[in-house]
Amino acid sequence: RFRQHILQQIERINTGQQVERRHKKYLSRQLTRTGNMIAFDKMLEDLYREEPRQATEYLSQLGGVIVYLTIRYGRKDRIEAAYFPYIIKKYRLIENRPFSGVVDAMYTLLREASIYCRENAMQALYTTGDCDCIMKALKILDGGESFFHEKLLADGLLEFTGDHEALGRCIEKSFADFSPEMQVAMMSFLRL
């Protein structure tokens, strides 16, 4: 079902047209169901193998849909809420264009008790390539009441898609503002 809808939009992209508004509305309705999101994910995997440039362009035109779905998934139970940041990370939906609504929703998930929500939100945020975004996320995690393992954080920082040296400078500049536990994770990143 998704395949036919998406392939029609890919054909539009191939002819220099935009993704249709009615398609965006269709996705906004259908993808609020986690089962449909899983099917959409599988369809996107195929599309990326077959036509990576068109798949990237297609997703880049879905900004409003992504913001809407971020809000909707944020209201779901924690396991379902954790799934959407995974999709954001997997397809780098906020890479070099951090939609403030999506990034703000990821910050909200960092405050959740669920480690899945927090880890997937951080993974999504690493794809922004934005040092300020990561520093804010680190401060949220550090100020939270839930434990976030330093190894997860140190390894995650290596996934940052932006300039690692610039991130290192930001971390060094604010190092003293963080708890000893957070400093350990930061030191692991800085050593690499």
What is each model feature region?
Residues 42-46, 50-60, 82-94, 119-128, ...:
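Structural detector for internal amphipathic alpha-helices that build alpha-solenoid repeat scaffolds
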Residues 74, 111, 126, 142-143, ...:
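Alpha-solenoid HEAT/Armadillo repeat architecture
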Residues 78, 129-130:
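Membrane-embedded alpha-helical core segments of multi-pass
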